């Protein structure tokens, strides 16, 4: 089973962790307020702290540049089938979405917290997608079904990482 592991910390600390794990598939992602390490693996996580998600669906391939968007969605048990059906329907159009490199639908290992991870050529393409009819339809359906999507949030990170920390 493929998993995604995420841990956060200062850039300096995360770079030290990366230096210790030369063989691992670990990527440093950053925005202007936060840094995180992202690992995809069928094995064990390389760091002790952080979140663990099971990959439910994956499409596309990562080019090695751009932005990564993390969309966190908390759902009640009865909302999960509706959400999964909407995601499945939307995923049929991902290959046609300009600037979209890859998507991953993941679920936290011990709660009804989903994380949609999408890799984009640039932040502009992501914002264009959010304005698209399909994205708006999904948002409206979630609101109509009284989901907790209003409590969800998204974070945008750049890759490859940039360096603030000369240490």
UniProtKB/Swiss-Prot annotation:
EC code(s) of this entry: 1.14.-.-
Sites annotated Transition state stabilizer: 129
Consequence when changing residue 135 to A: 21.9% reduction of heme-degrading activity compared to wild-type
GO cellular component: cytoplasm
Domain ABM as annotated: residue spans: 67-154
SUPFAM superfamilies: Dimeric alpha+beta barrel
Function: Catalyzes the degradation of heme to biliverdin in the presence of a suitable electron donor such as ascorbate, with the subsequent release of iron. Hardly any CO is released by the heme degradation reaction. Binds heme. Allows bacterial pathogens to use the host heme as an iron source. Release of iron from heme may play a crucial role in the pathogenicity of L.monocytogenes.
Protein name: Heme-degrading monooxygenase
Organism: Listeria monocytogenes serovar 1/2a (strain ATCC BAA-679 / EGD-e)
């Amino acid at each position: 089973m493929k998993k995604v592991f995420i841990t956060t910390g200062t850039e300096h600390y995360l770079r030290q962790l990366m230096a210790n794990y030369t063989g691992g598939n670990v990527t440093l992602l950053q925005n202007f307020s936060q840094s995180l390490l992202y690992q995809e693996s069928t094995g064990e996580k390389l760091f002790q702290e952080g979140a663990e998600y099971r990959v439910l669906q994956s499409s596309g391939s990562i080019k090695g540049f751009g932005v990564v968007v993390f969309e966190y969605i908390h759902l009640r048990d009865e909302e999960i089938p509706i959400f999964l059906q909407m995601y499945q329907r939307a995923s049929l159009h991902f290959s046609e979405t300009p600037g979209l490199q890859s998507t991953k639908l993941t679920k936290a290992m011990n709660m009804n917290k989903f994380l949609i991870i999408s890799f984009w050529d640039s932040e502009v393409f992501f914002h264009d997608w959010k304005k698209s009819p399909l994205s708006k339809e999904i948002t409206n359906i979630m609101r109509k079904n009284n989901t907790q999507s209003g409590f969800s949030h998204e974070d945008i990170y750049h890759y490859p990482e940039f360096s603030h920390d000369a240490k």
